[in-house]
Amino acid sequence: MRERTKNAFSFLFLQKGGWLVMTKETKLERDFQSKLIKELKKIFVGCLVMKLDSSYIQGIPDLLILYNNKWATLECKKSAKASKRPNQDYYVGLMNKMSFSRFICPENKEEVLNELQQTFKT
């Protein structure tokens, strides 16, 4: 009898410049990011949330939040244990020195959003 394993799946999408592989893990992060954007817009009424292009600058955080005269970036991860891409630590650290930047995942979401609220209040 064959041993059962978890099913892993992926999708291939043709995009300008080549193929994009969409894995189950990528979908989990995308779903988390989508819900997070809705929550950010609810908390910070009138803010702009923009997705940044990591193919332009490798390691740049996923989201830029503009609110009144302040800004922040967030790098979304599907879990606290998710791997980081090259340069992500560098850019999150650099942008945190400039304003506010964090890695955010379901496990630390409330803590990060509370910190962001404090930053946007000052």
Kindly label every feature range from the protein language model.
Residues 2-122:
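Catalytic phosphate/metal-binding cores of nucleic-acid and nucleotide-processing enzymes, i.e., regions
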